[in-house]
Amino acid sequence: MVKRRTAAVLPNNLPHLQHLVKKDPKSYREEFLQQWNHYETAREIFLVNPSSDISEFCSLIDFISQTCNYYHDVTADFPSELIELLQKNHTIFPFELCEKIVLCLVLLKNKTVISPITLLQCFFPLFRENPTRGVRELLYQQVSLTIRNANKQAKNDKLNKAVQSALFTLVDGSGSGSATHTDYSGQKREYSASELSGVWAVKMVRDLWKRNVWSGDARAVNIMKSAALSSNPKVMLAGIYFFLGADNQEEEEESDDEGPDVSKLLHQANVNKKTKSREAALLRARAVVKKKERGKQNVPTNVNFPALQLLHDPQGFAEELFEKHLASSKSRLSMDQKLVVLRLLTRLVGSHKLTVLGLYSFLMKYLTPHQRDVTQFLACLAQASHEFVPPDALEPLVRKIADEFVTSGVANEVVCAGINAIREVCARAPLAMTPDLLQDLTEYKSSKDKGVMMASRSLITLYREVAPDMLKRKDRGKLASIEMKDRTPLKYGEELNVTHGIQGLELLAQYKAEHGEEGENGDDWDNWEVSEDGQNSDDSGGWIDVDSDDNIELSDSDEEEEKATARKESDEKGSSSQKELVDRMTELASQSILTPNDLKKLEELREQAGVDRLVNGPKRSLKRPDDAVEADEIEGPRKKAKNDREARIASVMEGREGRDKFSSKKAGFNPTSLSNKRKQRNKNFMMIKHKLKGKAGRSLVQKQKVLREHVAREKRKIK
């Protein structure tokens, strides 16, 4: 009886029926079949007349999507019908119906009625065909959410490959034709296929890379590589900005939010007064730190390589970028867009040490002080310089910068930018500089302008490290002059800042040679050396046999010969000690195992050598060749220009707005003086304490007398 009364109201109450079906599917099968027949009838009517009311149809779709998993025999074709309905009629359906069908398909995927690949295969063609922005945004959100959920527990390579293939097709299909669609403002406009789908595909790859779903995935990098070579400017710029920004993404995320300093808060809690608000702040800070630590522990195990390092063919990519966007006469990019392409190209050349010789001749015409954004071009030139670029290709550029920027008749800022640009180029390719030009540029070390002086001295510091023989003798410095004897001249193709073997091992070898082997480990090492080499330990100490004193003849009259002989003996002794140190270092590296004590001592010697280097040597370390160069590094320190009279007056008047005049605050409020009662109230306590003391000691008669006088005064006021 109860069921019959409930069933009487069910056809008009789908949420109630949905609840009952989920509780007891077998008992309400007939009611479900009734709604299924309503759905089929409404679908046929709606296909014939799409302008009819969609509210009832949307309700039926939602109801069947929620309950279809309980009646597989009836609803087996329901997902395919929804997919077909959406794919064939998405351009004529209203947005509300498209949204309902999309959400129902996502619900079916969550109920495992359809697979994620089937869902994505339905959605991706709509990116290219549907002109409605709202539908594309909805599809983008659902596709991105589906991919993130599928990769939450572990990498779903099968799904990722299918999605990346579809995205690659969308990006690579730029120029596959165009179609006329209604603009968002209601006007007709030509949209290419890449404009409709390529931008969304690039946006999705960038978002999934940022969320660490596809970070470090080479296939995602290939998609963005194809986007950077697209003929559509929007897709091209999105792909280029991905490569320019993905390298520093992890560093930016770490530096943006450092979090609270718990040690500082603990110190403040011990010193300051304890209050509830400070205790709550400390608890919140601890909670934030614990949350960050848990986040670091749950980081995915895949390594997030920089996007530029994951390119399959960087040389071919660089050449294609240059030929398509910069060197081609068919390129219609603006100067700002070309500059963005140039930033990526030079970053690619410097990072992978590629050779694109046409790039340097392309940059030649932009290296003038009057060129707009010239510091950007100078930074790009520095990024594109490395050891494997022929000096003949870079030397004309360095000479032109010196002739255009470092000359008389230009501002000090221009000279500073020119010398800084030359320094950045030569830091990566020292052979691009000639000795004559270097010595001319070092003359600016005594300039009165701070920026020019610092730029010139930084150039001197650089060549003290890499090639002190190119500097004048007075500019080499003591340490560089001493090291010149053992330094080999720079050669073309010789890499800079490359550590061979164990860094600082020569320091440990020198320490062991000076102090000897101590302790049991040292004795064991000496015994092992004797048994291995078959030589006496005294002979292995590096002693040099000399002749007896009888064979030495001294001439008091020839002092020059004595000095020459002493200098020769000193050189022989130095070369012998250097050879002994090299042999000792070779033995340590090849025939011994470094103990924990050795490693600890090696670390101490490295730190000490670093301190000595900072005290006695250059203050600036060489930059790595793959470091990016910013325009601010080229401009150098800039002196703030003085304001003219109009600017100073404007600044003064701006500061006066909303401010009272400098005058007494009492003036103008009340022209009359204060009453005696108010003055008495504002007097200092020390001035009236004697009167108050007498007032407190009055007798009852005196108090009555004062009270009668007060009453009489009040009566006189009333009259």
Curated annotation (Swiss-Prot):
Transport is among the record's keywords: yes
Main location: nucleus
Cellular location(s): Nucleus, Nucleolus
Acidic residues: bias regions: 519-536, 546-562
Record's signal peptide: none
Gene Ontology cellular component list: nucleolus; nucleus
GO biological process: protein transport; ribosomal large subunit biogenesis; ribosomal large subunit export from nucleus
Region Disordered: start-end pairs: 515-583, 614-682
Sequence ranges of Basic and acidic residues compositional bias: 563-583, 635-663
Keywords: Nucleus, Protein transport, Ribosome biogenesis, Transport
Family in the record: Belongs to the SDA1 family.
Free-text function comment from the UniProt entry: Required for 60S pre-ribosomal subunits export to the cytoplasm. May also be required for 60S ribosomal subunit maturation and accumulation.
Name of this protein: Protein sda1
Gene coding for it: sda1
